[in-house]
């Protein structure tokens, strides 16, 4: 028996157990008005399903509930986005939403009935009940976005909607999925409760109230089954759509690579080299070796920064990158989208003139025998390093900045990689940080700054 068959059998056994409990309880009570048996409820459910009016009512209530949920998602996303940038705004909004979150649904519905009337009460109730859950989940997700990876994307010219698709949405998506599983079911409960309390005409809540007045317990349970089924179906569909949205957003960002590359501080938008002048001043007080340092790199020049660990080499390169962004950079720490392929990691930051064929050729030159479609998480440290170098070489911008680029490579791999860097530098400025003079020699750099 397969695992799937075992799971189905286990679920069937659980359902049979609770059905038996229901039958036993109904027989024990012996009063259909209090607890009808499964047969009576099944007949009532069949009658409702065969009635076309039932579906119109269910669809109408569902549309209002989903409308309130969609409004909460939009407003919660906007509020969370603002809160992630402005701490004062977050401190202002959080108490109000925490209060709404703790308020009983009945109290909210009664207030909404006074303010809005019964026609719009379900939409407003769902909105208010879902908004805190959406906001706090998105705020937490945005607070935990991988900042170093975001820095890498921005530096390589991936901004705006492409940054959102390639990075932000993928980082926040697990929090959104967790929120959706909790909020969708709660929204159906809040919406139906609002309809019931407000006695809105032509709604599921009204039908449940009528069943209660007429003591039609079987109909009441049948409507409950329909609401639970509708809530379950909505949750499954929406969660599936959210899961699919992650890969779809990533593919959109990869296909649109090279869009929006614009430099500043003299950086040429066409990728031509530009002069780099950097006065560190007091911008790096934690690195005394950089105090007062002035870095001047002529257009197309090559400079190596050497020094012991902790002297500020990486800090200097980061400051330089900020002056000429967008440019390409290999960071000292690995910055890759682990769940995506080596090819996509290169293409997402690549110049618009680069296609999959160019990227594949370079990857296979740097990493002989590589499967470019394999996830980078499955590659060795040296292979991952060369994927980052390929990404840097195929990115637009006016400079290539390499921070300890040959870490994890043997001498042969280092020399082959350095040769590829020189072949594809294309006149751009090259800035290298290393502790090994051999790296500078491999890249034909004679101008060395020692910290």
Name what the model sees in each region.
Residues 356-371:
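Conserved ABC ATPase "signature" region
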Residues 375, 404-405:
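Walker B catalytic motif
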Residues 333, 339-352:
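Q-loop/switch helix immediately C-terminal to the Walker
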Residues 375-379, 383:
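Conserved ABC ATPase signature
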Residues 124-128, 161-194, 227:
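Transmembrane alpha-helices
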Residues 403, 410:
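ABC-family nucleotide-binding domains
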Residues 389:
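Hydrophobic anchor residue at the start of the ABC signature
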């Amino acid at each position: 028996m397969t695992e799937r068959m075992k799971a189905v059998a286990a679920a069937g056994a659980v359902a049979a157990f609770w059905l038996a409990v229901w039958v036993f309880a109904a027989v024990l009570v012996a009063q259909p008005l209090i607890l009808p048996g499964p047969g009576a409820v099944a007949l009532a459910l069949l009658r409702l399903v065969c009635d076309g009016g039932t579906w119109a009512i269910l669809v109408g209530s569902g549309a209002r509930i989903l409308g309130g949920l969609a409004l909460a998602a939009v407003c919660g996303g906007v509020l969370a986005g603002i809160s992630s940038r402005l701490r004062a705004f977050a401190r202002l909004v959080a108490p109000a939403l925490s209060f709404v979150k703790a308020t009983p649904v009945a109290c909210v519905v009664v207030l909404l009935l006074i303010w809005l009337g019964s026609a719009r009460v379900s939409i407003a109730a769902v909105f208010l009940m879902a908004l805190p859950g959406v906001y706090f989940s998105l705020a937490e997700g945005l607070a935990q976005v991988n900042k170093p990876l975001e820095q890498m994307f921005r530096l390589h010219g991936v901004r705006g909607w492409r940054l959102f698709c390639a990075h932000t949405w993928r980082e926040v998506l697990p929090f959104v999925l967790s929120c959706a599983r909790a909020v969708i079911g709660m929204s159906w409960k809040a919406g139906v409760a609002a309809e019931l309390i407000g006695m809105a005409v032509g709604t599921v809540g009204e039908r449940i109230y009528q069943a209660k007045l007429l003591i039609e317990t079987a109909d009441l349970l049948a409507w409950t089954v329909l609401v639970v089924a509708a809530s379950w179906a909505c949750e499954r569909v929406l969660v599936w759509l959210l899961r699919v949205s992650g890969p779809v957003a990533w593919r959109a960002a990869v296909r649109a690579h090279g869009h929006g590359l614009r430099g500043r501080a003299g950086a040429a938008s066409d990728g031509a080299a530009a002069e780099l002048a950097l006065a560190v001043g007091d911008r790096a007080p934690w690195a005394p070796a950089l105090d007062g340092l002035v870095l001047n790199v002529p257009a197309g020049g090559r400079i190596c920064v050497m020094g012991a660990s902790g002297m500020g080499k990486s800090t200097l390169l980061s400051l330089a990158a900020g002056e000429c962004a967008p440019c390409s950079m290999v960071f000292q720490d690995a910055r890759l989208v682990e769940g995506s392929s080596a090819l996509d990691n290169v293409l997402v930051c690549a110049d618009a003139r680069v296609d999959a064929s160019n990227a594949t050729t370079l990857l296979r030159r740097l990493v002989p025998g590589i499967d470019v479609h394999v996830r980078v998480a499955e590659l060795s440290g040296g292979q991952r390093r060369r994927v980052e170098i390929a990404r840097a070489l195929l990115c637009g911008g006016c400079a290539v900045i390499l921070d300890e680029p040959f870490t994890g490579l043997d001498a042969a791999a280092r020399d082959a990689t350095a040769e590829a860097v020189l072949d594809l530098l294309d006149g751009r400025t090259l800035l290298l940080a290393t502790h090994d003079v051999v790296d500078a020699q491999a890249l034909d750099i004679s101008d060395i700054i020692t910290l």
